[in-house]
From Swiss-Prot:
It catalyses: L-seryl-[protein] + ATP = O-phospho-L-seryl-[protein] + ADP + H(+); L-threonyl-[protein] + ATP = O-phospho-L-threonyl-[protein] + ADP + H(+). Activated by threonine and tyrosine phosphorylation by either of two dual specificity kinases, MAP2K4 and MAP2K7. Inhibited by dual specificity phosphatases, such as DUSP1. It comes from Homo sapiens. The gene is MAPK9. The keyword Metal-binding does not apply. This is Mitogen-activated protein kinase 9. The modification Phosphotyrosine is found at Y185. One of its GO terms (biological process) is modulation of chemical synaptic transmission.
Length: 424
């Protein structure tokens, strides 16, 4: 590293077991989380005068997988612009040449909490439906550009105390082709759709299954399909939802179909029993109607056969959600992915390194006085959208205010390489 560059623009601080070498504009660094993708600190941006999250990517050039993931996250974050997607405020490296390049820092909005901290709260129907609406709007925005998130889970969804919600972590997101086959194990196990578990081709509504799992967790206060491994995860799904039909079985690879057909048969549990009235808010007759609608939405998202599962557009128009519908949010213009070969790219580590370095340098070129050119002037602050239907929604009372923009500590990727681990 150049001493002159480091001394004039950067300073170093020890954060847990990692050294953060950051621009001097970012002060008061405080670790708030870590995960497979990197370490995150809260900081104060002295240029913009706001609190931000600074994420140091974890060993981005350790191997081709890490490098491609880092490139993918950077490209997608630079493209998306939606109130329910976390905003990228800055990108930098303390190294001044490609030869020295080894660290990538992403600066993003800082939120108050992630959904892990909200799950154990008692949410009324207004708050729950509004959180889900925002989740679906963010996903719709990604899907409109052919981007599947693939790693939706409570720790990847962050909120403010006013109920504003944003989706983050795009290291596993990818652009989509119709009914394509991809790496089988991408989403954290508990939120993994059946078509992923079984190694089938999958499409955008793989994210809808994850939303259904998250909604179920918000309702029950606990993970709804908590498998101990890949096979047990499938067992937990069919024990509650029932063994899928012969029509679905025909879509499976022969070895997987043989395994699934030889498992014990389960009739499934009615959704009225999986999600009984008493676990929902029930203070009024209106709550009873909302409970019925919420349960119906769950029953349409948690469908084993993806061809019969609700789409994001249908979910946004569902009676439980549509009360919040705003075309400006739900039908926002799709992001323009400027790298058409984002998924087809395969490179050696050094080539990935050069691509990422160019992205970082491009950002620096477009930056001036701490604000990126052409970036909306309010992009540096969190959205304070207020649902027109109710003012009470704008407070998640007693929410922890420990600020966060961090994944949980578990890895998003499991080590297995095939459907049901080769059907043990």
């Amino acid at each position: 590293m150049s001493d002159s560059k480091c001394d004039s623009q950067f300073y170093s601080v020890q954060v847990a077991d990692s050294t953060f070498t950051v621009l001097k504009r970012y002060q008061q660094l405080k670790p708030i989380g870590s995960g497979a993708q990197g370490i995150v600190c809260a900081a104060f941006d002295t240029v913009l005068g706001i609190n931000v999250a600074v994420k140091k990517l974890s060993r981005p050039f350790q191997n081709q997988t890490h490098a491609k993931r880092a490139y993918r996250e950077l490209v997608l974050l630079k493209c998306v612009n939606h109130k329910n997607i976390i905003s990228l405020l800055n990108v930098f490296t303390p190294q001044k040449t490609l030869e020295e390049f080894q660290d990538v820092y992403l600066v993003m909005e800082l939120m108050d909490a992630n959904l892990c901290q909200v799950i154990h709260m008692e949410l009324d129907h207004e708050r729950m439906s509004y959180l889900l609406y925002q989740m679906l709007c963010g996903i719709k925005h990604l899907h409109s550009a052919g981007i599947i998130h693939r790693d939706l889970k409570p720790s990847n969804i962050v909120v403010k105390s006013d109920c504003t919600l944003k989706i983050l972590d795009f290291g596993l997101a990818r652009t989509a082709c119709t009914n394509f086959m991809m790496t089988p194990y991408v989403v954290t196990r508990y939120y993994r759709a059946p078509e992923v578990i079984l190694g089938m081709g999958y499409k955008e509504n793989v994210d809808i299954w994850s939303v259904g799992c998250i909604m179920g967790e918000l309702v029950k206060g606990c993970v709804i399909f908590q498998g101990t491994d890949h096979i047990d995860q499938w067992n937990k799904v069919i024990e509650q939802l029932g063994t899928p039909s012969a029509e679905f079985m025909k879509k499976l690879q022969p070895t997987v179909r043989n395994y699934v057909e030889n498992r014990p048969k389960y009739p499934g549990i009615k959704f009225e029993e999986l999600f009984p009235d008493w676990i929902f808010p029930s203070e009024s007759e209106r709550d009873k109607i909302k409970t019925s609608q919420a349960r119906d939405l769950l029953s349409k998202m948690l469908v084993i056969d993806p061809d019969k599962r609700i789409s994001v557009d249908e979910a946004l128009r569902h009676p439980y959600i549509t009360v919040w519908y705003d075309p400006a949010e739900a039908e926002a213009p799709p992001p323009q992915i400027y790298d058409a070969q984002l998924e087809e790219r395969e490179h050696a580590i050094e080539e990935w390194k050069e691509l990422i370095y160019k992205e970082v340098m491009d950002w620096e070129e477009r930056s001036k006085n701490g604000v990126v050119k052409d970036q909306p002037s309010d992009a540096a602050v969190s959205s304070n959208a207020t649902p027109s239907q109710s003012s009470s929604i704008n407070d998640i009372s007693s929410m922890s205010t420990e600020q966060t923009l961090a994944s949980d500590t578990d890895s998003s990727l499991d080590a297995s390489t095939g459907p049901l681990e080769g059907c043990r």
